[in-house]
């Protein structure tokens, strides 16, 4: 008498559909040289947890994976979130590294922005500690659409409308966002399959639906109206962000080329006032933005930049003006002997 044997339960990696695996694999293949170490920033929520599952499924040979978790104590359930991340790491056979941070008040930032800054600083610290140069982030199409709407409502410029980039660098760490073209519904479907398979459940962040926070207000109040009137609007807005990114890159290329004609000197700290005045008003502004960014100066508001532009236009033809001392974020712009300088 023969007996049947039950098929083994699929692993978490087997549960991950191709639609979620492929973008991660493509992002990793594009890295040159290929990384030996990789990390996923995991909060304990569904998005980042499922990105960890996808990364484990497509991890290249010779590459090790870690999960980075930032515990900032803003929520009463923060300890539970950390425990959930450790549980996920155990299921995937991946080490979990945790950084505890405190979000200080009074930095001139809202709580959302302050927490985000603390999170990036903590991730950079973990990356240095473990020799990791590439961190995967789980931002998806819905996040991208919300970001575009928020920046539009805040009056952002062309670069801001490009929203989140698939690859960006900050504090010496490369951040990859392979899911910017993935709808969150696919991620939640995988989270449901993982829960059914092994019982692991993603945590719920109450601030995600608290309309006191700007992003949550867009998500809970504006997005449902757009869903009802324009189904699929997130994909349209995400496409707009890609187009804005291309346009911003073209503008940046023109600004770099223009600045090279301004006789830059002293590692780009100074340029010719007369040559700058030969540019159109729009290109003058872009050249100034490029210059300030190249000197690691925070970008001024549009009004502040316009004031600098006005003062430079009105200087004596030879550029001798001891009264020009345009101060911004601890830096000083001055003009001497026909050249514009920036000092610490």
UniProtKB/Swiss-Prot annotation:
Record field: catalytic activity: cytidine(34) in tRNA(Ile2) + L-lysine + ATP = lysidine(34) in tRNA(Ile2) + AMP + diphosphate + H(+)
CDD domains: TilS_N (cd01992)
Record bears the keyword Transit peptide: no
UniProt binding sites for ATP: 43-48
Record bears the keyword Metal-binding: no
Annotated EC: 6.3.4.19
Keyword annotations: ATP-binding, Cytoplasm, Ligase, Nucleotide-binding, tRNA processing
Main location: cytoplasm
Record-level GO cellular component terms: cytoplasm
GO MF, any single term: ATP binding
Domain of life: Bacteria
Transmembrane stretches, start-end: none
Compartments, as annotated in UniProt: Cytoplasm
InterPro entries xref list: Rossmann-like_a/b/a_fold (IPR014729), TilS/TtcA_N (IPR011063), tRNA_Ile_lys_synt (IPR012094), tRNA_Ile_lys_synt_N (IPR012795), tRNA_Ile_lys_synt_subst-bd (IPR015262)
Any single GO BP term: tRNA modification
HAMAP family the UniProt entry points to: tRNA_Ile_lys_synt
NCBIfam families linked: lysidine_TilS_N
Family annotation (PANTHER family): TRNA(ILE)-LYSIDINE SYNTHASE-RELATED (PTHR43033:SF1)
Described function: Ligates lysine onto the cytidine present at position 34 of the AUA codon-specific tRNA(Ile) that contains the anticodon CAU, in an ATP-dependent manner. Cytidine is converted to lysidine, thus changing the amino acid specificity of the tRNA from methionine to isoleucine.
Protein family membership: Belongs to the tRNA(Ile)-lysidine synthase family.
Domain-related comment: The N-terminal region contains the highly conserved SGGXDS motif, predicted to be a P-loop motif involved in ATP binding.
Protein name per UniProt: tRNA(Ile)-lysidine synthase
């Amino acid at each position: 008498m023969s007996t049947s044997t039950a098929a083994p339960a699929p692993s978490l990696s087997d549960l991950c559909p191709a639609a979620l695996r492929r973008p991660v694999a493509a992002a990793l293949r594009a890295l040159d040289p290929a990384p030996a170490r990789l990390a996923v920033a995991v909060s304990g929520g569904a998005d980042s947890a499922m990105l960890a599952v996808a990364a484990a499924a497509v991890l290249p040979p010779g590459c090790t994976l870690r999960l980075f978790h930032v515990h900032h104590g803003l929520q009463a359930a923060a300890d539970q979130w950390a425990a959930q991340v450790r549980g996920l790491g155990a299921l995937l056979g991946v080490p979990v590294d945790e950084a505890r941070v405190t979000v200080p008040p009074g930095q001139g930032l809202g709580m959302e922005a302050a927490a985000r800054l603390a999170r990036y600083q903590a991730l950079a610290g973990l990356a240095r500690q473990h020799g990791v140069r590439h961190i995967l982030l789980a931002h998806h199409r819905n996040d991208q659409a919300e970001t575009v709407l928020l920046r539009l409502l805040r009056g952002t410029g062309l670069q801001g409308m490009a929203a989140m980039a698939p690859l960006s660098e900050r504090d010496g760490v490369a951040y990859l966002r392979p899911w910017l073209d993935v709808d969150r519904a696919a991620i939640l479907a995988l989270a449901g399959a993982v829960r059914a398979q092994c019982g692991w459940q993603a945590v719920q962040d109450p601030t995600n639906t608290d309309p006191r926070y700007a992003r949550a207000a867009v998500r809970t109040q504006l997005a449902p109206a757009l869903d009802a009137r324009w189904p699929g609007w997130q994909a349209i807005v995400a496409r707009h962000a890609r187009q804005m990114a291309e346009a911003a890159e073209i503008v940046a290329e023109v600004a770099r080329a223009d600045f090279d004609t301004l006789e830059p000197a002293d590692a780009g700290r100074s340029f010719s006032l007369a040559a700058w005045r030969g540019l159109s008003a729009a290109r003058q502004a872009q050249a100034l933005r490029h210059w300030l960014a190249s000197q690691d100066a925070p970008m001024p508001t549009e009004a502040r930049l316009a004031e600098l532009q006005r003062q430079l236009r009105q200087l004596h033809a030879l550029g001798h003006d001891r009264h020009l001392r345009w101060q911004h974020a601890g830096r000083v712009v001055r003009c001497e002997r026909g050249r514009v300088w920036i000092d610490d």
